[in-house]
Amino acid sequence: MSATRSQRSSTISPARPRRSPATIPMKRPETPSSSHFSASPVTSSSPLLRSSPSPSTSSAAASSTAVASTKLKENITVTIRFRPLSPREVNNGDEIAWYADGDYTIRNEYNPSLCYGFDRVFGPPTTTRRVYDIAAQQVVSGAMSGINGTVFAYGVTSSGKTHTMHGEQRSPGIIPLAVKDVFSIIQETPEREFLLRVSYLEIYNEVINDLLDPTGQNLRIREDSQGTYVEGIKDEVVLSPAHALSLIASGEEHRHVGSNNVNLFSSRSHTMFTLTIESSPHGKGDDGEDVSLSQLHLIDLAGSESSKTEITGQRRKEGSSINKSLLTLGTVISKLTDTKAAHIPYRDSKLTRLLQSTLSGHGRVSLICTITPASSTSEETHNTLKFAQRCKHVEIKASRNKIMDEKSLIKKYQKEISCLQEELTQLRHGNQDDLADRKLQVKLQSRLEDDEEAKAALMGRIQRLTKLILVSTKSSLQAASVKPDHIWRQAFGEDELAYLPDRRRENMADDGAVSTVSEHLKEPRDGNSSLDEMTKDRRKNKTRGMLGWLKLKKSDGVAGTLPTDGNQSQASGSPSSSSKYTQTKTTRRENAAAIKSIPEKTVAGDLFSATVGPEDSSPTGTTIADQMDLLHEQTKILVGEVALRTSSLNRLSEQAARNPEDFHIRDQIQKLEDEISEKKDQIRVLEQQIIEIFGMTPYASDSLGMPQVLSKLTMQLNEKIFEHEIKSADNRILQEQLQMTKSENAEMQETIILLRQQLDSLAERQSTQQIAGDESSGKNIHNRNGEESEIYSGAGTPTSVMSLNRVFAQEETKEIYNETALNSQALEIENLKKEKMRLIEEKDELGKLNKKLTEEASYAKELASAAAVELQNLAEEVTRLCNENAKLSR
């Protein structure tokens, strides 16, 4: 008696006094529900109410869980969870009306004979993890093996249903623990592969809403061979626990909640979180391999409400809908326990319609009833216990679900993966034909890039030399300065014609003379003296041309006998300009030594030496502009030569790296380096001359003349840039044609070499066979005593054994050649197959690496999204706690 007393007091708050109970017999009393079904005393063999096992038998019952799960029939697992008295109930003076008598019995404080027995009773100190291990873990394990499972919480409002199912950050509820347990089971089952989908809905005022898709409102319930389902519900495939929990958190944001006088945050709707589990053997199985399909329903029911909640308006309508659905649920449970019931009203509410497959026995069911021990809600608690007692008598038959049709999503994905793999294989076979062409293109592209710089420099040099030979504006500018109405054509001299063929040189000289005379005749007759003088000068300098004129100016400049010096100095009228010009002439004479060092063999050297020019000539704007143009062209030519020699130097350096003992290559490298340094010195001298010529212009101090010179130079620069762009485009086209021609020539050379080798080998074989045939024919003739040695002369046809042997040898040679060609082709095909297999393996490895990186990236994104959701939940929880603290402090 004392032992029983101490056990009861351990589950009751010590701060609450209670009356001493009446004398209680040692055996287990009958419950009100059991007396309704049977008048005999309750025993352990009663089919309607299982008695509470003794401590000695509890361990045996726990150890035989696996055996019990294999039975054909079993009952709904019913557990009860007490919550402690709330501060509001304590302040109102409520006392404890119901308490847990051990782990399997609940008794009434005021009527100890009123007691109920269940599969497990949890007191207030019990954690949610302990509740999950006993009440829900077996259901979750069965769902992973293909057996449907349902876990739902039932109780009055503010009894702790949502706390039990969802929990909080420090104490997760049944739903988070089940999700984590599912992924743990997947990790520990490597022989099977799984596909998980989740859906989340609510039943609000008898209307089904999709919490994962806010646009899914007022959904309809349908039925097929697998059972009932919601049409149009969103199924989201999940890959990790964080992903699933983030979906739950997003769905909770759309759930309907409200407040009443007993609960600040009261659920105003039933919610059902469904986890659809598909599994099949890992790897590629047979086509007839079955797929397990099961659903795990985790349901948080809204609490039944009485008139004590004092709700009005919309809250009253919500409470009415909640009570109606819960009443229908109770009616369905009662009909299921009545063997004589002909009709079960599943369709009277949306909740029972969704639970039709579950309650009709297709799967395991665990009911967690949450109750409060407060005396103010004693009647509601009693009704909850009676509902739980009725549920305990519902029989179910759990069986593994298998689907053989095409409704399995995992089968659909597997077939799609197989189709994609076949397409990938076909693409690999198709791409093998293009690999050789692509490799050849890569090689040609690399060779083109190597030679591009040298070719560009060479083409640029050709263009600049062409411009220097064919274009001259010097004489026309001088003629325009003397008489603007007269325009003279510049004739080519012997120096320019030396670069042309003999026939073209004669034609050009004759054309120049004729054109000069014709232009004289076309001009008006005024200014005869000036024209005569200009004609004499032109005939005198006719054979010199531009280069000869420059050389003549050079000799005149050295003598210093030009009469225009004094005029120019007097015309300037400025001592500063005169002294500046004198200083410039002195500087240019000092650079004469450096100028003479430039070789005269090249065109650049001739033009460079010609620019020593008229040291004492008048520095007019046109003269200086022409000299600067000429110096710029010479600089470009030298730069092109430097680029060409640099490219040659790079190639020789590569050859020297391959053949370090070749002294001839080293000598060539040293020679090229000396030439490059010499060209660079010449470029520096030309740049210095350009600067000096620009400084000696008479417009340096005249602000009116300088813009004209600059505008002229700008126009010339634009014209040359345009010409350069056009010729660059032509150059690119020519380079492409040249490259194509080179590749064709290389292929033809390779073919010719191969044919020559084959011809040589055939000739050797033919000669060998001919010698062997001669020897054999000689032996045959000797054995036949000369009878066969006669030669019958005919009309050019072979009449001896030797001739016949030659014919046979030719036929054998053809056969050998054909056999050799076939062998070479077979060997080439074998090499191509090996190369193909190697490329396929490399592509597979790259595909695996890409897939791995993609999975890691998706997993990182999921973790980031889950972390963001957790942070948001924490922020909301902090806000809620702050609000509660503020209200409590008031």
UniProtKB/Swiss-Prot annotation:
Domain Kinesin motor residues, every copy: 75-394
Record-listed ATP binding positions: G155, V156, T157, S158, S159, G160, K161, T162
InterPro entries: Kinesin-like_fam, Kinesin_motor_CS, Kinesin_motor_dom, Kinesin_motor_dom_sf, P-loop_NTPase
Keywords: ATP-binding, Coiled coil, Microtubule, Mitochondrion, Motor protein, Nucleotide-binding, Transit peptide
Pfam families per the UniProt record, alphabetical: Kinesin
Record SUPFAM superfamilies: P-loop containing nucleoside triphosphate hydrolases
Span list, region Disordered: 1-66, 511-595, 768-797
Cellular localization per UniProt: Mitochondrion
Biased composition regions of type Low complexity, renumbered to the chain: 40-66, 569-579
Biased composition (Polar residues): 1-13
Coiled-coil region: 395-468, 664-693, 729-765, 818-884
Transit peptide: 1-73
UniProt-recorded Gene Ontology molecular function terms: ATP binding; microtubule binding; microtubule motor activity
Entry GO terms, CC: microtubule; mitochondrion
GO process annotations (BP): microtubule-based movement
Protein family according to the UniProt entry: Belongs to the TRAFAC class myosin-kinesin ATPase superfamily. Kinesin family. KIN-7 subfamily.
Protein name: Kinesin-like protein KIN-7C, mitochondrial
Phylogenetic classification of the source organism: Eukaryota, Viridiplantae, Streptophyta, Embryophyta, Tracheophyta
Gene: KIN7C
